[in-house]
Amino acid sequence: MKKEHVLHCQFSAWYPLFRGVTIKSVILPLPQNVKDYLLDDGTLVVSGRDDPPTHSQPDSDDEAEEIQWSDDENTATLTAPEFPEFATQVQEAINSLGGSVFPKLNWSAPRDAYWIAMNSSLKCKTLSDIFLLFKSSDFITRDFTQPFIHCTDDSPDPCIEYELVLRKWCELIPGAEFRCFVKENKLIGISQRDYTQYYDHISKQKEEICRCIQDFFKKHIQYKFLDEDFVFDIYRDSRGKVWLIDFNPFGEVTDSLLFTWEELISENNLNGDFSEVDAQEQDSPAFRCTNSEVTVQPSPYLSYRLPKDFVDLSTGEDAHKLIDFLKLKRNQQEDD
């Protein structure tokens, strides 16, 4: 895998080519000061709120106690930076997409941070929703700091123009998502995306699902992407229509799910024990899914559910983060 392969999988690199078969999206350049703010791990103070300042007296003991904390002469006042012009652009884009969006950077979405949102979802309606997810996500940090990890070429890292991608929010059923592996423009493997769960309909419809994905690949994807080796994700809706979700590099940086990268690169044993579709045709890809509830596994995102900020709290190293976090949660509840 080379750096150019990673660049070709940036959302803005492929979206214009496949706009007609994917979810409507808006791409906004990410200002440098916003990037700096997202990478600043000093506090959990989140920017992007439009609440006017208030000077009313506290109407509860909790608020009085809150003010007492801030009266401590040794306590620094923590305020979030504001980005009014960018905030306006983001809100206009969100409104144009129906009021709710799925956010991501050039490559990654903050899937590892869904648990921190009030609705335990990546559904965002405001810039502050997006910032909370992004600042809590290791995936987003890696996009910023290690975009070319596992690349084999030694050339200097290309300059990256970071972008905020806002995708129209759609309620996608995890059991209808599949990851497809392409080598030399040939579809060699299809894996259930949410492999930690057993879905009865996949086992019953596997041949039809495989056939639909093959037809979609041949009609819309094959020979049209910028590389010969790549990975793409699709969603098959209740009517059987297939939608393109994303592209990823063909290599270790991408999760191989129910395959191994050794199998995919060598193409050995692809139609082994896991295969559920007869490879009667030479071009038929291997299809793998979770076959029973016995093989169900914990979510791969569970390991991300204890940020260092909370570890700091348990050791008493940073109580200010807890205060900021609780304030944010209360404000979100008031908005709802």
Curated annotation (Swiss-Prot):
Positions of Mg(2+) binding: 246, 248
Subcellular location field: Cytoplasm
Post-translational modification note: Phosphorylated.
Sites bearing Phosphoserine, chain numbering: 60
GO molecular function: ATP binding; magnesium ion binding; protein folding chaperone
Residues engaged in binding ATP: 104, 107, 109, 111, 167-170, 177, 179, 193, 233, 246, 248
Domain of life: Eukaryota
Record-linked InterPro entries: CDC123
Gene Ontology cellular component annotations, sorted alphabetically: cytoplasm
Signal peptide residues on this chain, from the entry's feature table: none
Gene Ontology biological-process entries: eukaryotic translation initiation factor 2 complex assembly
Protein keywords: ATP-binding, Chaperone, Cytoplasm, Magnesium, Metal-binding, Nucleotide-binding, Phosphoprotein
Family assignment from sequence similarity: Belongs to the CDC123 family.
Database matches in PANTHER family: CELL DIVISION CYCLE PROTEIN 123 HOMOLOG, D123 PROTEIN
Summary of subunit composition and partner proteins: Interacts with the eIF2 complex gamma subunit EIF2S3 (via C-terminus); the interaction is direct. Interacts with the eIF2 complex alpha subunit EIF2S1. Interacts with the eIF2 complex beta subunit EIF2S2.
Chain's role: ATP-dependent protein-folding chaperone for the eIF2 complex. Binds to the gamma subunit of the eIF2 complex which allows the subunit to assemble with the alpha and beta subunits.
Protein name: Translation initiation factor eIF2 assembly protein
Organism classification: Eukaryota, Metazoa, Chordata, Craniata, Vertebrata
